[in-house]
Amino acid sequence: YLETITWSFTDEKINNKFKEKLESVKIINPISSDLNVLRNSLYPNLIFYLEKNLNRGFGDQAIFEIGPTFTGKKPGQQKTVVCGIKKQFIDEDNSSKNKNLIDVFHIKKDLVQSLTELGIEKDEFIVEDNTPSYYHPGISGSVVSIDGNFVLGNFGALHPKIISNTFGFEIFLENLVDYKSKNIKIKESLTFSDYQKSDRDFAFL
């Protein structure tokens, strides 16, 4: 994956496809007509640049971004998300020299590996099929903490009405931190004796 840094603004038309039930935060004086709302998801901007790269002749695409998303106008209604997106192909198979289409298992592997790097082990989460509407039903999943209290991320094929043959994943860093803070194992404090240390050397005949 190549890292991408984009605006926190995006086009309201594409943002509406990803906002679900969230509130659109409109900008009073946007710098451009296609950057007129704060993004509810990182996907709109990633899709924009992915398609732009494809139009310039770049074939395989795998890009990601770490940045803020906005769920409302009030203070604190901002979330930090890791989002990655892949288009169409993976690396060539050295044995057959043919390119293999990406499937949901490839993007799931990317998500699981990312969670592992962030300190979440495989036995700390389960996969459910309750994903947002911008994912393809049946070709996507939601990663939920083992206690069922936190949605750590989503992965899968993006809905073909939005973009075809494209897979992505999201990791919600605040949820990850909240889960870890509530399930951290604290070691017992080390207790020292009030008495001086002494050693004895016994010899028996």
Segment roles from a protein language model:
Residues 1-205:
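Extended beta-strand-rich architecture
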